[in-house]
């Protein structure tokens, strides 16, 4: 393409749901606002309760706190701008704002992939080596595992975002999405992006497949260990300790795979928007609900924390 067709953009326009009637957009605003608030409150509550209750000062809940923090971070990066767009029809986002949104969406997404694998390893050690669990999963080891889970997000987000935004863009600045994701922004580039696309595909496969294989390996060994337990009660107790995590992993990877690994012919921009909503907005809300309602220890901790707060308030009055 001739250099005269290149342009230096100062802002982008997020098309998101602009094709829908105003009434539908207002309805979506209310729905997404409720989901957003439930996500923030649910995950914040998990963080506070697991910090406040001594009974939850274990590796499993240390990892859960980090997962809740990542879910909050991903929502804060994407949802507020989407809500403002739906309510005020302000669809513009600055060049720097778009790059920042893309960077942190990559960072939190990649970190979550590896953290879910770390949580699977934690369940594997707890079920397959219960006597050695306190030694193997001490505070220092857990801190290292969390750091190792967060770290891949930095190079992936830095390389992919800086590389993409170093390309020249065409005259159009309309991003056909509700946030600055890589594929819709890449369509605006006026340059040969073959090398970048190869890097993006290989990077996405590695980021998704490496944690996925670690999770499958952990749960294969967990299943084998559970089948060796003689009593049905023992099997149920062992499975219940990892059922919440298994459900969260399934929701995350199914929605992520449907979004990024479907063929272009079967994955229209509108379908991709709906699928992106599932892993960026709906799944973080469901995660907090799953870990709150399906986990007896968290429910009991919530009850204890509530009664302590109520008793303290009564004493003050």
Give short role names for the model-derived ranges.
Residues 1-317:
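Transmembrane helical core of 7TM receptor-like proteins
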């Amino acid at each position: 393409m001739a250099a005269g067709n290149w342009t230096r953009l100062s802002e982008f326009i997020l098309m998101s749901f602009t094709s829908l009637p105003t009434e539908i957009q207002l309805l979506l605003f209310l729905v997404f606002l409720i989901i957003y608030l439930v996500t923030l409150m649910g995950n914040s509550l998990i963080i506070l309760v697991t910090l406040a209750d001594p009974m939850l000062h274990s590796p499993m809940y240390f990892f859960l706190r980090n997962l809740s923090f990542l879910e909050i971070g991903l929502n804060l990066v994407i949802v507020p701008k989407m809500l403002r767009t739906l309510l005020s029809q302000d669809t513009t986002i600055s060049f720097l704002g778009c790059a920042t949104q893309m960077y942190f969406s990559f960072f939190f997404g990649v970190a979550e992939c590896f953290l879910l694998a770390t949580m699977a390893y934690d369940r594997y050690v707890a079920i397959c080596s219960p006597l050695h669990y306190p030694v193997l999963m001490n505070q220092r080891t857990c801190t290292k595992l969390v750091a190792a889970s967060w770290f891949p997000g930095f190079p992936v987000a830095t390389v992919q975002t800086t590389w993409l935004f170093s390309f020249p863009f065409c005259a159009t600045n309309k991003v056909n999405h509700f946030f600055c994701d890589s594929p819709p922004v890449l369509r605006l580039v006026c340059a040969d992006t073959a090398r970048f696309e190869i890097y993006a595909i290989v990077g996405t496969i590695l980021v998704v497949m490496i944690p996925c294989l670690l999770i499958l390996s952990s749960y294969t060994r967990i299943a084998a260990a559970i089948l060796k337990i003689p009593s049905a009660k023992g099997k149920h107790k062992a499975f219940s300790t990892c059922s919440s995590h298994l459900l969260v992993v399934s929701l995350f990877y199914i929605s992520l795979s449907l979004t990024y690994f479907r063929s272009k012919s079967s994955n229209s921009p509108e379908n991709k928007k709906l699928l992106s909503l599932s892993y960026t907005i709906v799944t973080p809300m469901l995660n907090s609900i799953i870990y709150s309602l399906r986990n007896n220890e968290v429910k009991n901790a919530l009850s204890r924390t509530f009664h302590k707060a109520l008793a303290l308030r009564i004493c003050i009055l």
